[in-house]
A protein has these predicted regions:
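Short, contiguous acidic and Ser/Thr-rich linear segments
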Residues: 11-19
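Short strand-turn-strand beta-turns centered on an Asx-Gly dipeptide
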Residues: 8-11, 54-56, 258
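Short structural boundary motif marking the start of a folded domain
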Residues: 2-6
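Short, structural beta-strand-to-alpha-helix junction motif
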Residues: 19-24, 65, 323
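Catalytic alpha/large subunits of respiratory electron-transfer oxidoreductases
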Residues: 91, 95, 148, 153, ...
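Fe-S ferredoxin-like electron-transfer domains
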Residues: 48-207, 215-245, 249-251
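A basic, amphipathic helix-loop patch mediating RNA/tRNA/ribosome contacts
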Residues: 21-55
Length: 439
């Protein structure tokens, strides 16, 4: 894509031709409100508050692409009226339980209601009873749901599970007279909102890989972790940046911490968060944090037994599912005490790398997952992406969905999740041990 120049509120902005106006504005520190849009997902036009004026015509910044010389105005009297009406509609029948809602203090509905100056309500419709649902690790409260569809988009475009969809809401239809009296976009958004809720894509059970990304992207308190629900207020927590210790991918995350209880000042991890516009977590990273709260790993007797075992051993056999830090410890032990390190997986991978380099004249270490995200053709050999490296799976799926890419997936075990990425992906299930042949 070629470089272009556009003007947003009089400010010259460099952009790539075809880049969404919303992303150009964000890159240049220009505020355009948006609830439904996620950077790594397809636009859904669910919220419509990203309305702007481009060359005199109203467009949606999340879906309209920048063109050279385009002049954009982010706020006019009509746009302000539309945005305010949209936020009023979102607030219709929304439960006034902010004091106990798990999202209170970091709720985008709260923030935008204040941002748009909504201090009175002009609209109403009879509410319907909506029963909360528990989907394993996830709690869904449809009464709090604003149907922004971020969870649906994340599950499809980021993760690849496609486990969520919009389902019929039921209840009274909107008064037809509202179409003539309300701002156009506010009415269209309300009409859609009034017909829909979020539900499992297949039956009544949520069939997914339990990554919890839908919880992370939810702007309100509709989707929360069942373990975190009603345990803490957001403003009581201290976010500690860290790297996930469950595998060598080292995903960036935040541990939200506070004291264990009123009579126990020891810090405790209450939940894990991530920068979902840039990186997604797997279920291990998001939900597997309680090992830090337990005391088993602090057993001095067990630790001494492990030390004695190391003293007697001359060989260490280990699995590939270890962190970079653990691998470094093994290397240091080998250098200092002369241990033999045995890992069958690593040996097979070494053989594969030798064959790959001889065949292609290239090394696999010349790229990272960010390059996968931006690729249009990907080949995966030897790894069961669903469990071996979920982040690689997310990148694979995202490239196929967002770049209209294609790919080949080689593995002995059939994987319905990977097969569901798209029609341009060919999955080849071969006999075990033929990975090097496929290269």
């Amino acid at each position: 894509m070629s470089d272009i120049t556009i003007k947003i509120d009089g400010k010259e902005c460099k952009a790539k031709e075809g880049e969404y106006i919303l992303n150009v504005a964000r890159a240049n520190d220009i505020f355009i409100p948006a609830i439904c849009y996620l950077t790594r997902c397809s636009p859904t036009l669910a919220c419509r508050i990203c309305l702007v004026e481009a060359d005199g015509k109203q467009v949606y910044a999340c879906n309209a692409k920048a063109k050279d010389g385009m002049e954009i105005t982010t706020l006019t009297e009509n746009i302000a009226e539309e945005r305010r009406a949209i936020m009023e509609v979102y607030d219709v029948n929304h439960p006034l339980e902010c004091g106990v809602c798990d999202q209170s203090g970091e709720c985008e509905l709260q923030n935008y209601t204040l941002e748009m100056g909504v201090d009175e309500q002009h609209y109403a419709i009879r509410d319907t009873h909506k029963v909360p649902q528990d989907w394993g690790l996830i709690h869904y409260d449809p009464a709090l749901c604003i149907v922004c569809e971020r969870c649906v988009s994340a599950c499809k475009d980021m993760i690849g599970d496609s486990a969520l969809k919009t389902v019929p809401r039921g209840g009274d239809p909107l008064d037809k007279e509202l179409k003539n009296s309300m701002p156009k976009d506010a009415y269209a958004m309300w009409n859609k909102l009034n017909k829909s809720l979020i539900g499992p894509a297949k039956g009544d059970t949520l069939e997914c890989t339990d990554c919890g990304e839908c919880i992370a992207v939810c702007p309100v308190g509709a989707l929360v972790s069942s373990d975190f629900q009603y345990t803490s207020n957001a403003w009581e927590l201290t976010s500690i940046p860290a790297a996930c210790a469950h595998c060598s991918a080292g995903c960036h995350l935040y541990y939200d911490v506070k004291h264990t209880s009123i009579d126990n000042p020891e810090p405790k991890i209450y939940r894990v968060k991530n920068e979902w516009n840039y990186v997604s977590l797997c279920g291990a990273g998001r939900f597997g944090y309680d090992f830090e709260n337990r005391t088993e790993g602090k057993d001095e007797t067990a630790f001494q037994k492990a030390i004695e075992a190391f003293k007697k051993a001359d060989t260490i056999r280990f699995s590939s599912v270890i962190s970079n830090e653990e691998a470094l410890i093994l290397q240091r032990l080998k250098e200092k005490y002369g241990y033999k390190l045995i890992n069958e997986d690593a040996k097979r991978f070494q053989n594969f790398m030798n064959i790959f380099s001889k065949t292609t004249g290239r090394t696999l270490y010349s790229a990272d997952l960010n390059d996968v995200h931006h690729s249009d053709f990907i080949v995966s050999i030897g790894a069961q992406l669903k469990s071996d490296n979920p982040r690689a799976r997310y990148a694979f799926n995202n490239a196929i969905k967002m770049n209209k890419g294609a790919g080949l997936y080689f593995h002995p075990v059939k994987d319905p999740v990977v097969e569901g990425f798209g029609k341009n992906l060919i999955c080849i299930n071969h006999k075990p041990g033929l990975d090097t042949v496929s290269s």
